[in-house]
Structures are given as C-alpha cells and as structure tokens.
Amino acid sequence: MNVTSLFSFTSPAVKRLLGWKQGDEEEKWAEKAVDALVKKLKKKKGAMEELEKALSCPGQPSNCVTIPRSLDGRLQVSHRKGLPHVIYCRVWRWPDLQSHHELKPLECCEFPFGSKQKEVCINPYHYKRVESPVLPPVLVPRHSEYNPQHSLLAQFRNLGQNEPHMPLNATFPDSFQQPNSHPFPHSPNSSYPNSPGSSSSTYPHSPTSSDPGSPFQMPADTPPPAYLPPEDPMTQDGSQPMDTNMMAPSLPSEINRGDVQAVAYEEPKHWCSIVYYELNNRVGEAFHASSTSVLVDGFTDPSNNKNRFCLGLLSNVNRNSTIENTRRHIGKGVHLYYVGGEVYAECLSDSSIFVQSRNCNYHHGFHPTTVCKIPSGCSLKIFNNQEFAQLLAQSVNHGFETVYELTKMCTIRMSFVKGWGAEYHRQDVTSTPCWIEIHLHGPLQWLDKVLTQMGSPHNPISSVS
C-alpha cells in the first residue's frame, strides 16, 4: 500500500500527527489509533496544539495531554484492546514496545496511567522506558567461616526435608494482597508464615481484592501493583524503582577489600530457555529466548518466529487422549515478559495456568513450593532480579550449600489447563499433561560464578586450603 492511498481518507490533523510516527509497520492500525485520538482531543481546547508541540519539540517541557479513562482502563483500536499510553508511546516513540511493564511516568506528569484518575495522560514524552537496575556485585569471602574439618554435606542432602509432601496452592488474585511496607519480608533462612492453606489466604494489614480501589481488579494489561504499597510516599503511582544500594551487602569494617572477591551480574544473550514436557517426558528441543517478550502457545507457526514457542508443532508417540485434549485447550497460552530485571507471566489462554516460582513465593510470604493459579486475563510477576540479588548476597555468608539451594529459585515450572498440589488430585507437576520448565540464564550463570569462587562443599575454602 502506497502513502497516497493510505492517506486518501484521512483528515489534515491526522496526517500531521502521523508525520511523527515511528517505524513502518502496521500503518493502518496507527492511522486508526491517531484518528480515534484526534476525535477525543478536538473536544478539548488546546489539546491538539499541546500534543503537536510535544511531538515537534521532544526536548522541551510540555503539558499533559489527556483523554477520559475508560471503565477497564483500555482503549480499543481496530479490534485490538490496549492501554492508551502504551498505544501512543508505540506510535510516536517506541514501535517495539510490548507492554505497560516497560513504561514509567515522568515526575512532571500530573495524570499518569497508574494514578487511576478520571483522565489519563497520553503524551508520549511524559513517559520513559524502564531500564534494568544495576545489580551490585556479590562479595564472596576469600576465607571460609566454617571449620575445614566440618563437612556440611549431610546438611546439604537434607535441605529439602522441611518441604511438604505435596505443594500448597494459591489463586491469583484472591490469595495475593500487597505485601506490607518492607519489600523483602523474609530472610533466606526464615519460615513462610503466610503459607496459603487454601486459595482464600490473605495478608494482614493489606486491602482485600474486593476493595474497589484494589489494583487487582484491573485487567492484565494494567500496571502491576507488585512490590510497594500505595501508602508509601515514594510511589504514588507505583513507578519508582527500589534503591539498588539497599541490595549491596554491608561488610564489617575490619574486612578490607582484599578479603572478598566481587562477582558481578552479566546479562546473557538468551535470558531464558524453555523446555516442554508431557507428564514426565521431555518433548522436543529447548526454546532459547532472545526477545524480552515471548509467547508460549498451543498453535503451529511454520514461519519459525523467534518470539514464539509453538507447542502445537511438537509430536510425541507416547501421547494419550488426556494430553491431546489438554493441548487443544492451551490456545493462546502464556505471554512471558522480561522487563527491568523482572519476569511477568500473563495468561492469554481461556484456561488457567499454574506456576511454581520460589522467587514469587518468597516475595508473597508463601511456602517455597506453593503453586499459584493465574486465571485467564491476569498477569503476575514471577521473578525479581533485585530480590534474588539480595538473597544471594546474604547467602554467601552461610556457605556453599545455602548458595547452591538458590539454584531452585532460578527454575520456574508452569502447567497449562491442569493444576497440581494439595487441592488437586495431581500431586506433582510431572503428573500434569502439559507443562514447561523455564530456566533463567542470568541468575543461574551468576550463581555458577559465585559457587566457583566459593569452592566445593567437599573442600570448603579456608585459610589453609
């Protein structure tokens, strides 16, 4: 389609605004999005002029350009629903923008999307892209705190003995409330007092999910309430990042830098790999994710899209009727985002997905092996690099085995359609018909480097080794 035919029925105002459009994909969709916006802005005196000023002078201060917030917060453009600030940031600034998780409002914005006001600002220059936080290096002591004659191998073997025979269950959002004001409620060796005995467990001193102001009432494509409560003065819109300095391990003054080895985090080429299983059988090759936005669905995609892991393509001679039926219900599956050092899972399937993430469970105060149900249309943060960094920094002072135990946190298991755990007749993930295992490469490689620096559990590092 040439430019002449594209603009043949567009108004002069829409033509002008499309002149600042970024990228060359989805021309017709962008035109419809801008046309819908122009119709709204024409009702407000000076709004069109303010938007044109912002687009033509990106480095100059500009005012909010607002439209009324819809009931569910989303805007429909040509059969596709999305959040308005995401739509217009995609049109005029970042064509590769995948999700609201990647955006943060600037301080000058009076009507940011996350503030839940009647008007929402769509000025693309009132938002910035989230950057991954810089994780402080882990400082590994050069000398062991342990007696070299004392072996921790027996303790190492028994680390999992306190785990229940089968995992407990929790349902999002019913079992999930905002954690209390401390973003990291537990130490790595603490118990999990808020373990959900059932899907109705709640947190003390936090709003229930039925509260009209609860962020969990919002659709999956809205900003996650996540890690900081609304009463915290630094996060009116939940947008401020945690101070990475709080992650830095504090060293006793008598320890000088020569007594520790700094091990830094490095972002790998592939942020994760995904392996698909049917019952206890691995099916097909591992999928290596290079894009920060990955779809795992039940369809077939002969184009070999690098952003999609299509389970419908995979064959298995041992497949039974239960597996076949479950595969038919995977549908659109799950959307995995890796943004700003955090991993989110959004259930796009009509059926629920079930997630076992120790990092997510730690954040919410659940038992480590709890399985969380994510219904259709909901999204949940399932891993946080900063919390992992804090745990790793603490664990190096407790020995090799404690650090090694964190490898379990770097693997996330997720089943489609059928759940497992105490509330289901399937007790283990290997009893579910269709499931995936997600390996987080960055945290795993970081752990590997720290463990290499520490030495082996059979021969702890010491002043005489």
Swiss-Prot record:
Pro residues compositional bias, start-end: 221-232
List of residues that carry Phosphoserine: 463, 465
Keywords associated with the record: Acetylation, Cytoplasm, DNA-binding, Metal-binding, Nucleus, Phosphoprotein, Transcription, Transcription regulation, Ubl conjugation, Zinc
Protein name per Swiss-Prot or TrEMBL: Mothers against decapentaplegic homolog 1
Post-translational modification: Phosphorylation of the C-terminal SVS motif by BMP type 1 receptor kinase activates SMAD1 by promoting dissociation from the receptor and trimerization with SMAD4. Phosphorylation by ERK2 MAP kinase in response to EGF or HGF prevents SMAD1 nuclear accumulation and transcriptional activity in response to BMP. Dephosphorylation, probably by PPM1A, induces its export from the nucleus to the cytoplasm. Dephosphorylation is inhibited by association with EGR1.
Gene: SMAD1
GO aspect biological process, one term: cell differentiation
Sequence segments annotated as region (Disordered): 162-249
Family: Belongs to the dwarfin/SMAD family.
Gene Ontology cellular component annotations, sorted alphabetically: chromatin; heteromeric SMAD protein complex; homomeric SMAD protein complex; male germ cell nucleus; nuclear inner membrane; nucleus
Localization per record: Cytoplasm; Nucleus
Keyword DNA-binding: yes
Biased composition (Low complexity): 179-210
N-acetylmethionine: modified positions: 1
Pfam family, one: MH1
Domain of life (superkingdom): Eukaryota
Described purpose of this protein according to its UniProt entry: Transcriptional modulator that plays a role in various cellular processes, including embryonic development, cell differentiation, and tissue homeostasis. Upon BMP ligand binding to their receptors at the cell surface, is phosphorylated by activated type I BMP receptors (BMPRIs) and associates with SMAD4 to form an heteromeric complex which translocates into the nucleus acting as transcription factor. In turn, the hetero-trimeric complex recognizes cis-regulatory elements containing Smad Binding Elements (SBEs) to modulate the outcome of the signaling network.
Subunit structure of this chain's protein: Found in a complex with SMAD4 and YY1. Interacts with HGS, NANOG and ZCCHC12. Upon C-terminus phosphorylation: forms trimers with another SMAD1 and the co-SMAD SMAD4. Interacts with PEBP2-alpha subunit, CREB-binding protein (CBP), p300, SMURF1, SMURF2, USP15 and HOXC8. Associates with ZNF423 or ZNF521 in response to BMP2 leading to activate transcription of BMP target genes. Interacts with SKOR1. Interacts (via MH2 domain) with LEMD3. Binding to LEMD3 results in at least a partial reduction of receptor-mediated phosphorylation.
Residues binding Zn(2+): 64, 109, 121, 126
Region (L3 loop): 418-428
Record PTM Phosphothreonine, positions in chain: 322
Record domain MH2: where: 271-465
